């Protein structure tokens, strides 16, 4: 079957790989000249299934109000009063209760755990290299309340069979030695020993090269103008002056998927702006071993081979991609506090990207209201964590194979029931 994939980020390229492995004739289209030049370019680098959780959680509405008056708040909302933003925020608000949180987190962990398994199998099969580490991740708590609240997430981890370690303050340095001098300011941590890290952009480009060798065609530097639809089926993709025709189509354009589909149906995917710093590594002993997550500021600090990636923050500001210097100040503040000697922070590269977020945090993976159009978008802050699993799952659905995990609650139909 001829399949066209719109989007060459980590989700689109992963989907292309698995579809090619299933025997399909695959073409990937993207406006950028190379894969992984937008949201996949500078993310925090962690592959953290156990930490997969929706931003829509109990207490978030009140916290969001408080954060409006804090300099280093992890979430910032700039209302533009557009229908798209207001509807998305209202749907998110409806998911901010314990029942929805438990349901949403459980299915996010399910997909993320499956994705980690798919990544590990891919690594065994191909030997793909992307500065990956399998050292687990450590979530740091600065308050007793955060430590106590961890029990809510632990219950979901136990139900999903995810190994974990709840660490007291004095145990943190045994996992991350460079924290030894500042553990007195922390209350403890939650460690997930099976989590991983790696450079998402490097992975995507390596996988794209392997996909090309396997027969995938990449049409890069092509602007997708619109889908051509007749009846209930897509009949082509208009790219500049070329119409590209296939039997099936996959929408993996992240935050831009919503606009491309609006003429035919709505999907609740909205951009959540994030930031990162990439710092040259100066001292191994002063750097994290793997990934450390600061629960207070929602910032992740990840070790690559010769670099430190500091990523986080969330801004609801539409499609604005300006680099906000205040967000850089927050990222610098966190890394100076936890790892002050890891590298020359003043030499850091500052980056921003738009994560495609659904109100309930769970991506849209599966069929759409159009017969031959499939969705693989809305992964939010977890595109890297969920990419391989989402790609394999979508390939199975498109190929009419039984998915290896439950998939019905991952489709867009959950918003139309």
From Swiss-Prot:
Catalytic reaction annotation: a D-alpha-amino acid + A + H2O = a 2-oxocarboxylate + AH2 + NH4(+)
Pathway the protein acts in: Amino-acid degradation; D-alanine degradation; NH(3) and pyruvate from D-alanine: step 1/1
Gene Ontology cellular component terms for the protein in this record: cytoplasm; plasma membrane
Binding site for FAD: 3-17
Names of required cofactors: FAD
Matching SUPFAM superfamilies: FAD-linked reductases, C-terminal domain, FAD/NAD(P)-binding domain
E.C. no: 1.4.99.-
Leader sequence residues: none
Sorted UniProt keywords: FAD, Flavoprotein, Oxidoreductase
Function according to Swiss-Prot or TrEMBL: Oxidative deamination of D-amino acids.
Membership in a protein family: Belongs to the DadA oxidoreductase family.
Protein name: D-amino acid dehydrogenase
Gene that produces this protein: dadA
């Amino acid at each position: 079957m001829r399949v066209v994939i719109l989007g060459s980020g980590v989700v689109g390229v992963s989907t292309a790989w698995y579809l090619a492995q299933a025997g399909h004739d695959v073409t990937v289209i993207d406006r950028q000249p190379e894969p992984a030049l937008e949201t996949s370019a500078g993310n925090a680098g962690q592959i953290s299934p156990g930490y997969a959780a929706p931003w829509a959680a109990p207490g978030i509405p009140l916290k969001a109000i408080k954060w409006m008056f804090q300099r280093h708040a992890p979430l910032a909302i700039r209302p533009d009063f557009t229908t798209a933003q207001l509807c998305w925020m209202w749907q998110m608000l409806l998911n901010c209760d314990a029942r929805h949180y438990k349901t949403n987190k459980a299915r996010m962990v399910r997909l993320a755990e499956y994705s980690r398994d798919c990544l590990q199998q891919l690594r065994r099969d191909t030997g793909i290299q992307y500065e990956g580490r399998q050292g687990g991740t450590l979530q740091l708590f600065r308050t007793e309340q955060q430590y106590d609240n961890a029990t809510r997430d632990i219950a979901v981890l136990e139900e999903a069979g995810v190994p974990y370690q709840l660490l007291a303050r004095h145990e943190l340095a045994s996992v991350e030695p460079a924290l030894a001098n500042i553990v007195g300011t922390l209350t403890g941590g939650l460690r997930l020993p099976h989590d991983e890290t790696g450079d998402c952009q490097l992975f995507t480009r390596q996988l794209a090269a392997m996909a090309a060798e396997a027969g995938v065609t990449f049409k890069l530097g092509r602007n997708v103008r619109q889908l051509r639809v007749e009846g209930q089926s897509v009949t082509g993709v208009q790219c500049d002056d070329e119409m590209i025709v296939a039997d099936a189509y996959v929408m993996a354009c992240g935050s831009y998927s919503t606009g491309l589909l609006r003429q035919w149906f709505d999907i609740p995917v909205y951009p959540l702006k994030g930031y990162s710093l990439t710092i040259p590594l100066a001292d191994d002993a002063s750097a994290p071993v793997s990934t450390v997550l600061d629960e207070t500021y929602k910032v992740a600090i990840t070790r690559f081979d010769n670099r430190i990636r500091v990523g986080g923050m969330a801004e609801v500001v539409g499609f604005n991609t300006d680099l906000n210097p205040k967000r850089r100040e927050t990222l610098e503040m966190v890394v100076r506090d936890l790892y002050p000697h890891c590298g020359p922070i003043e030499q850091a590269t500052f980056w921003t990207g738009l994560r495609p977020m659904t109100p309930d945090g769970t991506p849209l993976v599966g069929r759409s209201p159009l017969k031959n159009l499939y969705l693989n978008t809305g992964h939010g802050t977890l595109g890297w964590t969920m990419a391989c699993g989402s790609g394999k799952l979508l390939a199975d659905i498109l190929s009419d194979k039984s998915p290896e995990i439950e998939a019905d609650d991952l489709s867009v139909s959950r918003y139309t029931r």
